[in-house]
Every structure is written in C-alpha cells, then in structure tokens.
C-alpha cells in the first residue's frame, strides 16, 4: 500500500475509510485480510476535494479492482448542504449520470472508478469536444430530480455574499465590490423572474476539472458537487 507521510490517506479518518473499503471489496467477493493489499494513488484535477485511486487484487489474484475515494475539502460545506449533495449524487447515479456511489465515510465517499480522462482548459476549445459536452449537459438539464422544484440560485448567492463579507478584509471587500453585489443580485432576480420561468436541474460548476471523457468511446461524464 502506498503510504503517505500522514498515514493511509491524509485529511480523513483512516479506520472508518478502511472499514468501508473492506465492505465494498467484500460485496465484490474480494476478501481483504491485510490492509497492505490496498494501493493508494493520488490523483490530480480536483479543486476543492482530494481524490485517490484505490486498487486491490481480486479473489483470483490476477486482476485488480479500482475505486475512487473522494475526501471532502476543508470548509466546503459552507457552499452547499452535504446531505442534499449526497442525495443528488445518488439520484444522478440511478439515472446513469456520473459514477455510482459505493460507500460513505465521515470525511468523504467511495465512487465507481471511471476509466476516462479529466479534460483540460485546452480541450474546451476543441469544437468536437465542446459539442459532446453540450449534448451531455442537455441530458443533465432534462433529469427529472425528486423534491420541490424551487429556485435555489438567489438564496445561494446571498448566502455566499454574506460569507464573503464575513471573512474578507475591508480592503478585499472593497476590491471585489461586495457592498454593491447585494443590489445587483436583487436586480438580476427581478429581471429574470418575470413571466413564465421553467425551473431546471443545473450543474453550477462546469469547469474542465469536472468533465471527463472516454478516449475510445468519446462518452462524456460530468462530476457534480454543487448541482
């Protein structure tokens, strides 16, 4: 097992994670007797979380299983409700959008490992790839998600603005114009709420690090934490 200097995986409860990993392996018929059988590979691309590829030998010993462990970034809960995020993730998985949820532990979750490449900023300028992303995003927007169909945008913006004012220095608040953002949010809400408004399910964080593509099939997968 690849040990990092702070333990099994930093920033999380290693015993809880090992327990869940062993349970996942057991469901697939693999009996893990020694924790050294887990191989931990840090992955790049995530901005607010730490992600790791975890490998272990199958019961036949000639192949390896792979899962992705996502350790939540410190303090990101101020941006969204974690329970709501997990429910959304599970529902998206059932609709075939994104990886399957395999397990949870206090500091993160275990996901199906997607054999695809995380895109780069340069990829987004490729017309073919942009078209594939647009088609996938249309599927995403058309998902029939459970729960009330309420507009969350304005409440979220005001919450984030309040947090920004709380943690920013007076100099930073002035530089970013925080004092006028509240009025601008109200203007946008008024202008965009007139007439019939169709409420849809939105990604809210469509940057290249949250988009993956299978190089062979050209299938696009969207990773979402803020939908």
Which positions does each model-derived feature cover?
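ATP-binding pocket architecture of kinase catalytic cores
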Residues: 41-183, 187, 191-198, 216-217
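Juxta-kinase regulatory segment immediately upstream of eukaryotic protein kinase catalytic domains
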Residues: 1-41
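Activation of the activation-loop gatekeeper triad in protein kinase-fold domains
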Residues: 223-227
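Catalytic-loop of the protein kinase fold
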Residues: 201-203, 208
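Short, solvent-exposed secondary-structure boundary motifs
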Residues: 31-32, 89-93, 203
């Amino acid at each position: 097992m690849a040990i990092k200097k702070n333990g099994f995986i930093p920033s999380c409860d290693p015993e809880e994670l090992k327990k869940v990993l062993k349970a996942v392996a057991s469901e697939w018929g693999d009996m893990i007797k020694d924790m050294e059988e887990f191989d931990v590979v840090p992955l790049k691309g995530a901005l607010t979380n730490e992600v790791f590829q975890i490998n272990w030998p199958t019961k036949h010993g000639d192949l390896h299983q792979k899962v992705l462990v996502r350790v939540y970034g410190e303090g990101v809960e101020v941006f969204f409700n974690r329970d709501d995020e997990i429910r959304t993730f599970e529902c998206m998985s059932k609709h075939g959008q994104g990886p399957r949820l395999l397990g949870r532990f206090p500091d993160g979750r275990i996901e199906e490992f997607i054999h695809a490449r995380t895109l780069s900023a340069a990829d987004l300028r490729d017309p073919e790839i942009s078209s594939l992303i647009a088609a996938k995003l249309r599927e995403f927007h058309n998902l029939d998600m459970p729960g009330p169909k309420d507009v969350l945008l304005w409440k979220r913006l005001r919450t984030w603005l309040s947090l920004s004012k709380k943690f920013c220095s007076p100099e930073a608040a002035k530089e970013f114009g925080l004092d006028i953002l509240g009025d601008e949010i109200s203007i946008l809400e008024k202008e965009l709420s007139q007439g019939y408004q169709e409420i849809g399910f939105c990604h809210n964080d469509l940057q290249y690090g949250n988009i993956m593509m299978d190089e062979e099939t050209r299938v696009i997968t969207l990773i979402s934490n803020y939908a």
